[in-house]
């Protein structure tokens, strides 16, 4: 299986991902919330301080609350202090939890909006490179990994780190010699965690790539369910899904093995230190260098420090998952936006279009020196209908895709009203173009909003557009008329109705330049006659480029350009091209022979 391009790439324009890089990229989102975050950290610090205060209360209780020299004040002060500490701890934990949730959910919202904004404004090349499942994973699911990191990991790193610091400080206060023995473990633990981190990060990145592949398999199976069923491909798809799922399971287990090593090894090292401390403490007690209360407080503090250390070890695996998610999130945010153009306004174009020595090559073909379009030149007068004909793969669709700047030519110029299109504001240019593709796209919205997509829906204009597209009778019979939902990609409509709704959208836009890519290919003969008449009325006074594989639909074009292998090989009217007896005449004969058969 060839590797598919994905959004998973080093963030920060090629910088290796690390906590410092992630923090630097997240800082613009954190900065406006810094005081809320500081409040959460203060609350966590208070909570961590209460952990260190508990063993500190044991020493006076054991030394002065028991035996013949017991102090009545110590007997009652310590229980009251425990209750007070518990209350402070509860309030501080609630405050830190709420404040952190506020910060993380605001950052989640900002990241998600930024990602969707960049996705919707990126170039067409991005959508050809990335699968839909990869983009959905990044915007919907991967950004939640950041939420998990910001919530659980941040809480653990801050609160448990502060707990360790407070407890270590108290241990040094009690007995600095014994504490140094504990401190010797920290470099060993740090080396161990660093070793595991590198392996976990690599495994997480590979796991994410496989997750995208699995999502893509599901996406293909759902989108192509008819093909799967009619070709009895259920077992094939099941085998593909099972194979990829097993690979994912293998990576998950490898991650579990690597991530799970840190905790038991850390606990083993801590147990060795505890055994040494107990031995030395017993020796010190025999020479009155420590008290029972001091020894119990020291051991209790040591035992209490194990739990936050364990949490700090456990945070490693979700932290690495979050780092991998950051690579994907900022990989999308760093995608270049479409060029906005030169900013020249264009209220309403006259409709003059010129292709001047235009060449184009897709990036994948550049190394093979294969031009999709090669030195294309022609002019279209305002209101003229130009038809593009030719065998499949000759470059017709690529040519019309250059006009709204879905791609920019690699050579030559395209002009509208005598001005090179890069000089126009991109949105102003596209507002002059209506397009009906053979791949109809409808949104899960009302009929009216689909017809008026990108504009405010005017009921009168919507109905007029539907009438012109021969769809009004169908819509009028629907329960809610133009307010009826059409379903996912128009699933509530037939193929011909979906095509006519797309045509109604182009009619509603009322742009001076029309691009019709096999616009009537999905219509029955009766509907095609009505729609063809509506399109002919619509095309009057408008520049029109028509792509049709059925030559009968473009016979009345002012001029027909015949393309082959990215070049214009013939040009003329229908009758002129038939008289030339070239490629167009050959294609015409083949189609009419098939129709007769």
Swiss-Prot record:
Signal peptide per UniProt: none
PROSITE patterns reported for this sequence: ABC_TM1F, ABC_TRANSPORTER_1, ABC_TRANSPORTER_2, MSBA
Residues that bind ATP: 390-397
InterPro entries: AAA+_ATPase, ABC1_TM_dom, ABC1_TM_sf, ABC_transporter-like_ATP-bd, ABC_transporter-like_CS, ABC_transpr_lipidA, P-loop_NTPase, Type_1_exporter
Domain ABC transporter residue range list: 353-590
Domain remark from Swiss-Prot or TrEMBL: In MsbA the ATP-binding domain (NBD) and the transmembrane domain (TMD) are fused.
Protein's UniProt name: ATP-dependent lipid A-core flippase
Organism: Paraburkholderia xenovorans (strain LB400)
């Amino acid at each position: 299986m060839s590797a598919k391009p994905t959004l998973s790439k080093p963030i920060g324009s090629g910088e290796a991902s690390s906590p410092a890089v992630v923090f630097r990229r997240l800082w613009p989102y954190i900065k406006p919330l810094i005081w809320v975050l500081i409040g959460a950290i203060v609350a966590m610090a208070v909570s961590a301080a209460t952990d260190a205060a508990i063993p500190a209360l044991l020493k006076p209780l054991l030394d002065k609350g028991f035996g013949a020299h017991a102090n009545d004040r110590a007997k009652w002060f310590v229980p009251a202090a425990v209750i007070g500490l518990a209350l402070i701890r509860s309030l501080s934990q609630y405050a830190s939890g709420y404040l952190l949730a506020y910060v993380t959910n605001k950052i989640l919202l900002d990241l998600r909006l930024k990602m969707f904004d960049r996705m919707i404004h990126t170039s067409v090349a991005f959508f050809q490179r990335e699968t839909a499942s990869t983009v959905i994973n990044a915007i919907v699911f991967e950004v939640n990994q950041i939420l998990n990191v910001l919530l659980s990991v941040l809480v653990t790193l801050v609160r448990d780190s502060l707990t360790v610091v407070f407890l270590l400080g108290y241990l040094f206060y009690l007995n600095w010699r014994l504490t140094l023995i504990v401190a010797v473990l920290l470099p060993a633990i740090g080396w161990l965690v660093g070793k595991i981190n590198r392996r976990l990060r690599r495994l997480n990145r590979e796991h994410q790539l496989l997750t995208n592949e699995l999502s893509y398999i599901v996406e293909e199976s759902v989108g192509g369910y008819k093909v799967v069923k009619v070709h009895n491909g259920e077992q094939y798809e099941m085998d593909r899904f099972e194979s990829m799922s097993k690979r994912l399971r293998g990576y998950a287990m490898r991650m579990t093995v690597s991530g799970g090593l840190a905790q038991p090894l850390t606990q083993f090292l801590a147990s060795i230190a505890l055994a040494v401390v107990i031995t030395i403490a017993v020796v010190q007690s025999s020479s009155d260098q420590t008290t029972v209360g001091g020894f119990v407080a020291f051991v209790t503090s040591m035992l209490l420090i194990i739990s936050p250390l364990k949490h700090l070890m456990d945070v490693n695996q979700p932290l690495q998952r979050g780092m991998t998610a950051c690579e994907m999130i900022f990989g999308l945010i760093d995608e270049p936006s479409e060029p906005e153009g030169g900013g020249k306004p264009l209220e309403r174009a006259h409709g003059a279009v010129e292709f001047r020595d235009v060449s184009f090559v897709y990036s994948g073909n550049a190394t093979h020196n294969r031009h999709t379009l090669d030195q294309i030149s022609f002019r279209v007068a305002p209101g003229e209908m130009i038809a593009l004909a030719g065998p499949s793969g000759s470059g017709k669709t690529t040519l019309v895709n250059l006009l709204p700047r879905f791609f920019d030519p690699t050579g030559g110029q395209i002009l509208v009203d005598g001005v090179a299109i890069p000089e126009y504001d991109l949105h102003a240019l596209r507002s002059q173009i209506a397009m009906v593709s053979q791949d109809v796209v409808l949104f899960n919205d009302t009929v009216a909003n689909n017809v008026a997509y990108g504009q405010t829906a005017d009921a009168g204009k919507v109905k007029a557009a539907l009438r012109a597209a021969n769809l009004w009778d169908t819509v009028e019979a629907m329960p809610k008329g133009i307010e009826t939902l059409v379903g996912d990609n128009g699933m509530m409509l037939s193929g011909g109705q979906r095509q006519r709704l797309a045509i109604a959208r182009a009619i509603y836009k009322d742009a001076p330049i029309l691009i019709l890519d096999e616009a009537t290919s999905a219509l029955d003969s009766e509907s095609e006659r009505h729609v063809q008449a509506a399109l002919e009325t619509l095309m009057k006074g408008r520049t029109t480029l028509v792509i049709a594989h059925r030559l009968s639909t473009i016979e009345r074009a002012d001029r027909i350009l015949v393309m082959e292998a990215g070049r214009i090989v013939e040009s003329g009217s229908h009758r002129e091209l038939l008289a030339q007896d070239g490629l167009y005449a050959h294609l015409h004969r083949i189609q009419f022979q098939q129709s007769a058969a």
